[in-house]
Amino acid sequence: MASFITRAERSGNIFSRVTGLIRAGQLNWADRPLWYDVYVSSPPLTPPDWNVKLAKYDEPIRSIFYEEDVLRAKFYKTYRSTAGIQVDSSRTSVSQQFINEYKLVKSENAEATDDQLFEMTQKRLNENGIVLK
């Protein structure tokens, strides 16, 4: 079975192989590559590793959902936003205000379910003058 890493790559990284050639006299110091001096002056923080574990092609990709993502999706499912979001605006969007208020309500009512927290947040935002459509 063929491997994607050649035997030369397993014997060491390119820096160690060039260093070996210079020490053995097979490569003159004046003929060293341009990147060699840069590598010597500032080596990488973690050494290169040829034995990297790559994901297999048949492994499923894990779904990563944060609580805020699920809440934002539920918000937009309930209240369709017709307004555009301005990236350079200093104002927070209605959905972000909803999420911030939801976190406050959740910290005050830890025993409430998600649906109850959602309704409490709706009521609190309506009381504060933010109209949800």
Curated annotation (Swiss-Prot):
The gene is mrps-23. This is Small ribosomal subunit protein mS23. Pfam families: MRP-S23. Belongs to the mitochondrion-specific ribosomal protein mS23 family. It comes from the Eukaryota. Keywords: Mitochondrion, Ribonucleoprotein, Ribosomal protein. Component of the mitochondrial ribosome small subunit (28S) which comprises a 12S rRNA and about 30 distinct proteins. The lineage of its organism: Eukaryota, Metazoa, Ecdysozoa, Nematoda, Chromadorea. It is found in: Mitochondrion. CDD domains: At1g26750. InterPro entries: Ribosomal_mS23_dom (IPR023611), Ribosomal_mS23_met (IPR019520). GO terms for molecular function: structural constituent of ribosome. One of its GO terms (cellular component) is mitochondrion. The keyword Cell cycle does not apply. One of its GO terms (biological process) is translation.
